[in-house]
């Protein structure tokens, strides 16, 4: 009898190698999907912790301190609590609209992260219309809020959904005009090109100095889009109990808060990209690496330090919306609409005309 043990071992090792290769390929295919999701999740948890700590400091009290060191895990504890709570449905409401509304609000905002360049060569999709894609996708979120308000069969919820839709329409136009001014200055609507256009003159090349009026209008409009104080009329507790969230419980109730913080984070990221130079920094860090003769790591170092700079600018900017929550009173609905249509819209139009004129004269 002839033994074929070496051949059998070779076949087994080859099949094991092919299996490992296929497994590695599957895991590698999912890494680009799970990495941004993990990063966004951590970013939202950091925002929640920052808001609670800053709010506690402003009110001269102690913030969360029991869940993890310095209360870092408090947001995870709240999320776990909502995850295991019962999902209740209104007796005479539209069940489909009631269930789909929160998902539309979250998914539409998550898609916006696909065009955000976190650093050099760290962007999922570099489109020629990146900034306008963000505006188009973010305008879908109020539709989900309106569906939630209508499907709840509650007058407070329906009024909250109507307010969210009216507020989004009022402030979407000034926001778009400010973005259009930035596109004219950069000769591109790609988020990557806009950041690179600000890198020519370092710190003084940021669009913040060339578009100060546009920056202020963009800041106010983004606060209104995120429904942050003083623009939180869709969920005003004193008037509408909780607005479109009134009939929700459990994980669906938590999805609205996730959508709110996701929207706040992506708005702050776009402020960093459009006005604060993105991943660029005026310090020439590359010369430090040349001096220590470690140029081989530059391919890894540049995207990493770029992502760190982008996130640092973003979280520093987040102090503004968090602070305004405890310093400014809520506007009335008529004041909010007047501010959007009678003030911000004409000023943003004038800013666009000035930008267009300056670009024409510079040719």
From Swiss-Prot:
Q: Which EC numbers characterise this protein's activity in its record?
A: 7.1.1.-
> Biological process GO terms, please?
aerobic respiration; photosynthesis, light reaction
- Give the GO cellular component terms, alphabetically: chloroplast thylakoid membrane
Topology in membrane: Multi-pass membrane protein
Where it sits in the cell: the answer is: Plastid, Chloroplast thylakoid membrane
Function of this protein? NDH shuttles electrons from NAD(P)H:plastoquinone, via FMN and iron-sulfur (Fe-S) centers, to quinones in the photosynthetic chain and possibly in a chloroplast respiratory chain. The immediate electron acceptor for the enzyme in this species is believed to be plastoquinone. Couples the redox reaction to proton translocation, and thus conserves the redox energy in a proton gradient.
Q: State the family named in the UniProt similarity comment for this chain.
A: Belongs to the complex I subunit 1 family.
Q: What is this protein called?
A: NAD(P)H-quinone oxidoreductase subunit 1, chloroplastic
């Amino acid at each position: 009898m002839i033994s074929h043990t070496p051949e059998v071992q070779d076949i087994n090792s080859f099949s094991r190698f092919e299996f490992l290769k296929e497994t590695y390929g599957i895991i590698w295919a999912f890494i680009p999907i799970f990495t941004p999701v993990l990063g966004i999740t951590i970013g939202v948890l950091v925002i929640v912790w920052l808001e609670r700590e800053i709010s506690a400091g402003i009110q001269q009290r102690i913030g969360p301190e029991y869940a993890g060191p310095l209360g870092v895990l408090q947001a995870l504890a709240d999320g776990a609590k909502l995850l295991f709570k019962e999902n209740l449905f209104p007796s005479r409401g539209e069940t489909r609209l009631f269930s789909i509304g929160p998902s539309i609000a979250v998914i539409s905002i998550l898609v916006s992260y696909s065009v955000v360049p976190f650093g050099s060569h760290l962007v999922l999709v570099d489109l020629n219309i990146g900034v306008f894609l963000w505006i188009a996708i973010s305008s879908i979120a109020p539709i989900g809020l309106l569906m939630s308000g209508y499907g709840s069969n509650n007058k407070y919820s329906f009024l909250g959904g109507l307010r969210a839709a009216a507020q989004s329409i009022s402030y979407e136009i000034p926001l778009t005009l400010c973005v259009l001014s930035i596109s004219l200055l950069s000769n591109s609507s790609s988020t990557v090109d806009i950041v690179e256009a600000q890198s020519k003159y370092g710190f003084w090349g940021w669009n913040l100095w060339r578009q100060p009026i546009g920056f202020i209008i963009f800041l106010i409009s983004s606060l209104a889009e995120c429904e942050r104080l003083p623009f939180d009329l869709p969920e005003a507790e004193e008037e509408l109990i909780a607005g479109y969230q009134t009939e929700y419980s459990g994980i669906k109730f938590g999805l609205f808060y996730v959508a709110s913080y996701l929207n706040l984070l992506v708005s702050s990221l776009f402020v960093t990209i459009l006005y604060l130079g993105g991943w660029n920094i005026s310090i020439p860090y590359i010369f430090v690496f040349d001096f220590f003769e470690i140029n081989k790591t530059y391919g890894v170092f540049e995207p990493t330090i770029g992502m760190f700079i982008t996130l640092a600018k973003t979280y520093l900017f987040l102090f503004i919306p968090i602070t305004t929550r405890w310093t400014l009173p809520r506007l009335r609905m008529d004041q909010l609409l007047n501010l959007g249509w009678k003030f911000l819209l004409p000023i943003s139009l004038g800013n666009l005309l000035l930008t267009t004129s300056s670009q024409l004269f510079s040719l």
